[in-house]
């Protein structure tokens, strides 16, 4: 793993930051966030800041907007607030031009994302979620890159019915999106049942502790009575206040040696430190990771997280709240493009940030403990845990759980399995599904159903290590195809790899339709990031375990050029690699692409260093 710590100097927190040069960190702010809407406007804060303050704890005009049946949309401001409730307003971009030509409103619908800490659901919950998919969401359920489910295509008139059904499963969508702590991920390694149980519990505890306390969700979507009557001033958000966070905040819990949650790509992380019996003795805390950037703006960049320090188990929740509240108070509320925690740490320095976290916890953090990750992929097929239970990981392309004509019947098959399954289901950060906690005597029944419905226990090495975001046609930010394009590209690349004898070599490849990085392409050995229709930036050189960022190798590569661009590199890799050397490490050692030290260095020395 690369060393992400800043270089301290004798005269204070001036650092030689790769790609920026020697500079001195800014002095951290001492004032608390502005809590009055007019004052926020006068101070030049981003529009979302005074919108949040004036929203009545995330109510805004949502209740009234749902009653406007002449449109399938809600207002632009409510479109920002509804994110905190777990939704994005979208439209079908495949037919947008046609509808505009006919002078029709866009084909609006909503994406709904659930909050499922650790990605664990019971068979009963699965059946309810399946019924929602078939009733309101086009008979499809999507496992996300952050261990939860999304529904696409839910129209406005069905939103409250959908939310009521989700509530009946004892689940919700609160804080699945928006400027809050979002769904908390947890390690799913089935071979370490004891450590996983502790990681899952920490994820749930963090999710509950950092959950917004507003009653707006139940009031708006379930017609619940207002939790606090009278004026808004009577209702409080004890952790967030009226302003919530400057930007999204993502938290994960990892258990080495597997980094399937991609801990270095998140704002806050906890790495389990295990003894020789796989018992959790404490947690290394990581801070400041994040993927999103903006094309052409060098002051935006992905960043891998720093290891802040070590905490005892009893201090983990305090550390989580302390890290998040420092970001609440120090984060940039004027420029949302520079509002994530990664930029806060770049502005004020890791040492100043650590000191403030320690102040809020009330004690010093310990020195980080050693740990090792061996990859960020899933373990496919059957695995027996250290508790004697059995777990089957299924490969679900891009997480899309639906019945495919002439192919796997994911929706129907998993429904049948849920009807007989005695354990639970676990989503992975790689968009796959684990049929978990199966008694030994039930394996044959599960196997028979998997075979009957053509469910996939695995695929080629490349496909097993691939991910794609949704992109077109529903995502409003997509510049290029991703989920719909990746399968065809993988087929081409599989042929190329096979020609060079690399068909069994695990190489991570991820695709996103825009640079926001939902599928975490910048820590993938091969990363494709949409630039325009059928055009992508091609990134290479990330670490196989997700601990090092990639580097831009080729700009604006067309879809038809990608395989031809990579084939000579595959040939060189097959010929000149060292034993056990991963592709991302090879392209750096062989001099094809520069190594990225961390975020500010991401945009430096881009392009091929030599011809392949």
From Swiss-Prot:
Keyword field: 4Fe-4S, Amino-acid biosynthesis, Cysteine biosynthesis, Heme, Iron, Iron-sulfur, Metal-binding, NADP, Oxidoreductase
Quote the function comment for this protein: Component of the sulfite reductase complex that catalyzes the 6-electron reduction of sulfite to sulfide. This is one of several activities required for the biosynthesis of L-cysteine from sulfate.
Q: Identify the species of origin.
A: Methylorubrum extorquens (strain CM4 / NCIMB 13688) (Methylobacterium extorquens)
Q: How does it assemble?
A: Alpha(8)-beta(8). The alpha component is a flavoprotein, the beta component is a hemoprotein.
Binding residues annotated for [4Fe-4S] cluster, in chain numbering: 469, 475, 514, 518
Q: Report if keyword Iron is assigned.
A: yes
Give the family from UniProt: Belongs to the nitrite and sulfite reductase 4Fe-4S domain family.
Q: Which pathway, metabolic or otherwise, does it act in?
A: Sulfur metabolism; hydrogen sulfide biosynthesis; hydrogen sulfide from sulfite (NADPH route): step 1/1
Q: Which GO terms describe its biological process?
A: cysteine biosynthetic process; hydrogen sulfide biosynthetic process; sulfate assimilation
Q: Does the keyword Transferase apply?
A: no
Q: What is this protein identified as?
A: Sulfite reductase [NADPH] hemoprotein beta-component
Q: What is its EC number?
A: 1.8.1.2
Q: What class of enzyme is it?
A: oxidoreductase
Q: Where is this region: Disordered?
A: 1-26
Gene giving rise to this polypeptide: cysI
What's the cofactor? siroheme; [4Fe-4S] cluster
Q: Which Pfam families does the entry link to?
A: NIR_SIR (PF01077), NIR_SIR_ferr (PF03460)
Mind telling me which InterPro entries this protein's record contains? CysI, NiRdtase/SiRdtase_haem-b_fer, Nit/Sulf_reduc_fer-like_dom_sf, NO2/SO3_Rdtase_4Fe4S_dom, NO2/SO3_Rdtase_4Fe4S_prot, NO2/SO3_Rdtase_4Fe4S_sf, NO2/SO3_Rdtase_FeS/sirohaem_BS
């Amino acid at each position: 793993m690369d060393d992400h710590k800043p270089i301290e100097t004798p005269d204070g927190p001036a650092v030689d930051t790769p790609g920026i040069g020697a500079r001195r960190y800014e002095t951290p702010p001492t004032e608390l966030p502005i809590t009055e809407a007019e004052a926020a406007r006068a101070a030049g804060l981003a529009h979302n800041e005074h919108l949040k303050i004036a929203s009545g704890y995330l109510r805004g005009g949502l209740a009234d907007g749902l009653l406007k049946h002449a449109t399938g949309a809600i207002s632009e401001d409510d479109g920002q607030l509804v994110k905190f409730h777990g939704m994005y307003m979208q439209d079908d971009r495949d037919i947008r031009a046609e509808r505009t030509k006919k002078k029709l409103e866009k084909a609006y619908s909503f994406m709904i994302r659930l909050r499922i800490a650790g990605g664990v659901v019971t068979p009963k919950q699965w059946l309810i979620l399946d019924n929602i998919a078939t009733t309101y969401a086009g008979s499809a359920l999507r496992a996300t890159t952050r261990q939860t489910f999304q529904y696409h295509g839910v129209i406005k008139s069905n939103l409250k019915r959908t939310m009521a059904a989700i509530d009946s499963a004892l689940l919700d969508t609160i804080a699945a999106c928006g400027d809050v702590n979002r769904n908390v991920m947890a390690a799913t390694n089935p071979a370490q049942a004891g450590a996983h149980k502790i990681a899952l519990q920490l994820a749930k505890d963090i999710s509950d502790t950092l959950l917004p306390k507003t009653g707006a969700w139940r009031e708006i979507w379930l017609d619940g009575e207002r939790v606090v009557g009278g004026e808004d001033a009577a209702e409080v958000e004890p952790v967030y206040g009226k302003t919530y966070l400057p930007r999204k905040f993502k938290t994960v819990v990892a258990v080495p040696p597997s980094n399937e949650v991609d801990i270095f790509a998140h704002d806050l992380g906890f790495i389990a430190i295990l003894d020789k019996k796989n018992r959790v003795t404490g947690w290394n805390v990581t801070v400041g990771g994040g993927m999103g950037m903006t094309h052409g703006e060098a002051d935006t960049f992905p960043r891998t997280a720093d290891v802040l320090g070590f905490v005892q188990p009893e201090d983990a929740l305090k550390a989580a709240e302390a890290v998040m509240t420092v970001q609440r108070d120090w984060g940039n509320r004027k420029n949302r493009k520079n509002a994530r925690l990664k930029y806060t740490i770049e502005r004020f320095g890791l040492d100043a940030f650590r000191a403030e976290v320690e102040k809020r916890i009330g004690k010093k953090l310990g020195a980080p403990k050693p740990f090792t990750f061996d990859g960020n992929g899933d373990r496919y097929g059957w695995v027996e845990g250290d508790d004697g239970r059995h777990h089957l990981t299924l490969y679900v392309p891009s997480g899309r759980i639906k019945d495919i004509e002439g192919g796997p019947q994911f929706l129907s098959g998993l429904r049948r399995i849920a009807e007989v399954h005695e354990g639970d289901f676990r989503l992975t950060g790689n968009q796959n599904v684990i049929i978990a906690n199966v008694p030994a005597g039930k394996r044959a029944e599960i196997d028979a159903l998997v075979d009957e419905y053509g469910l996939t226990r695995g695929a080629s090495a490349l496909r097993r290590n691939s991910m794609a975001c949704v992109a077109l046609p529903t995502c409003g930010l997509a510049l290029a195809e991703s989920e719909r394009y990746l399968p065809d590209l993988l087929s081409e690349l599989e042929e190329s790899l096979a020609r060079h004898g690399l068909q069994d070599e695990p190489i991570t490849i991820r695709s996103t339709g825009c640079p926001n990085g939902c599928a975490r392409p910048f820590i993938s050995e091969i990363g494709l990031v949409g630039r325009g229709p059928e055009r992508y930036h091609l990134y290479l050189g990330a670490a196989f375990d997700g601990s090092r960022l990639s580097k831009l190798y080729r700009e604006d590569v067309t879809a038809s050029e990608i395989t031809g661009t990579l084939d000579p590199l595959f040939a060189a890799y097959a010929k000149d690699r060292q034993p056990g050397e991963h592709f991302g490490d090879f392209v750096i050692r062989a001099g094809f692409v520069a190594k990225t030290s961390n975020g500010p260095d991401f945009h430096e020395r881009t392009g091929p260093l030599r011809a392949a």
